[in-house]
Structure formats: structure tokens, C-alpha cells
Amino acid sequence: MAADSTPGSHHRNLFFQYGKAAIHRYHRLHLYGKAFIWLVILFYIAFGVFVIIVTPARIAQFLYDQAKLLAATRFGWVALLLSIICISFPPLIGHTTLVTLCGFAYGMKGFYIAFAGSILGSALVFVVLRFLFTEKIRSWSAQNEKWQALEAVVRSKGLPLIVLIRVSPFPPWVYANSLFASIEPVKLWQFVAATCFITPKLLLYVFMGSKMAALSDGDQRDRMDTHDKIINGLFLAGSLVIAVFTSWLVYNLVQNHIRHLHGVDPETDELAAEAIEDFDEDAPLLSPTASHRV
């Protein structure tokens, strides 16, 4: 019995729980969803083989050269900003990659591009989806208990709760935009204000991009002594660890907060938390089967 209470046992149990949940979700996917997952796996295997054959140094140098070419282009920043706006629309992905590219190509000045693109893109998604699917949202929420609970909680707690959900890493960027557009009590100004709170995350990814650029260029690497290379590598690794840890921490804090809101029925809390966890299956603007059930 004592062994079951050790930290190692707790982590193993947590790992198995997440594993079972992932397998359960996989089995519930449509055939196309399963095929997509396997295509992604094959892509990463092929990408890994490609990196090994071409070598990371040559790939990094090529990417650095292209990034600097983009930065030297007169309207390169406009292209990057428009790209961030475009990938804010579902089902496109790549927000984190493009934000990191802002730092890779422009250094810390790239933060302004990342911030402007993120704010404009998310606001545009919110307005377009809300305008096009208002009736669908109302019809869906009228017959979905989890969604009613989520809307009730958001309506009750307002902007502070919207901010907490927005800074959470789950749901991911593009799906979070759709999620908030699906929650009728959320106003545009609240959504934009909450999105401004992702500034620290944007700064972190832009910083990581700037450090990756310094280590990718062969000329810069040659001018660095061992100490500088280690420092840059530690900065990059530390930033990655911070990003992963804070994402995990914030998500768990948000879920715990939603489940223990003061002045809200515990059952409503639980249903609201489940609505966020199952966003890909239940959200009226995300689920491929939603249109058939509304």
C-alpha cells in the first residue's frame, strides 16, 4: 500500500490514465481522423530520416538564409503578419511556428509582428464565425447541457474567467479562436482583451526564435567561443522547458479553477470543464458531426 503512494507510482498512474484517454479518443475518431493521425506519424518519421540524411547544420543554415532573405524584403513583415492572420482560421495550424519565425527572422523586433498578427487574426476569426454561425450556436447550445453550463459559467464570471481560459494552452490557438466564437456570452472586446494576455507567451517564442537564429548561422557559430554557444543553448533549452512547464501548469490551474468556482453549482462547474476538455467533439463550430445533430 505504501508503494502506491510514492511519487513514482503517482506519475505512472497518471501516465497510464492519459494513455488510456488518448487510445479512447483515437477509437472514437472517424476513419478520416485516424488516417490523418497516421499520416502525421509517417510525416514525422520521413522528416526525421530527411534531417539525418541532409544533416541538421545544413538545414539550419538554409532556414537562416531564407529567414534573412524574408527580413531583407521590403514587405516581408507584411507577408508574415498576413500568414499569422490566415492560420488563425480553422482548420489551419502553425501559429507557434510562425511566431517563432518572427523571432528567427527579425529578432526581438519580431514580437510586434507576432502580437499584431495574433490580435488581428483572432479578432477576425471571432467576428467572421460569430456573424456566419450565430443561429447555429444558439440552436446547438439550446440542446447541449455541457455547452449551456460553459455559457452560464462564462456569463457569471465574465472577463477574468475568459482570460484564464484564453491563456491556457488547451485548446490550441486556432481551436481556441473558434471555441470563444462559439460561446455566445463572450463579447468581442472581452475576447480581444483576453488575447492581449498571451503577450508573455509570444515574447517567449520570439525569444526562442532569435536564439535559434544565432545558433543556425554558421558564421555566427564560428565567431562564438564554447562559452557563448553553451549560454545560447541553455537559454534555448531553458525557454523550451519554461514553455512546456507553464503550459502544463496553467492548464491544470484553469481546469481546477473552473471546477471550484464560488457561487456556481458544482455540477455546472464540472460540465463546463468537460465542455472545454471535449472542445473538439462538442463545439458547434469545430465538430464535423455538429451540423448533422443541430
UniProtKB/Swiss-Prot annotation:
It comes from the Eukaryota. Keywords: Golgi apparatus, Membrane, Transmembrane, Transmembrane helix. One of its GO terms (biological process) is mitotic spindle elongation. Residues 1-34, 96-112, 209-229 are lumenal. Residues 56-74, 134-187, 251-294 are cytoplasmic. GO terms for cellular component: Golgi membrane. It is found in: Golgi apparatus membrane. Residues 103-212 are annotated as: VTT domain. It is a multi-pass membrane protein. The VTT domain was previously called the SNARE-assoc domain. As there is no evidence that this domain associates with SNARE proteins, it was renamed as VMP1, TMEM41, and TVP38 (VTT) domain. Belongs to the TVP38/TMEM64 family. Golgi membrane protein involved in vesicular trafficking and spindle migration. This is Golgi apparatus membrane protein TVP38. It comes from Coprinopsis cinerea (strain Okayama-7 / 130 / ATCC MYA-4618 / FGSC 9003) (Inky cap fungus). The lineage of its organism: Eukaryota, Fungi, Dikarya, Basidiomycota, Agaricomycotina. The gene is TVP38.
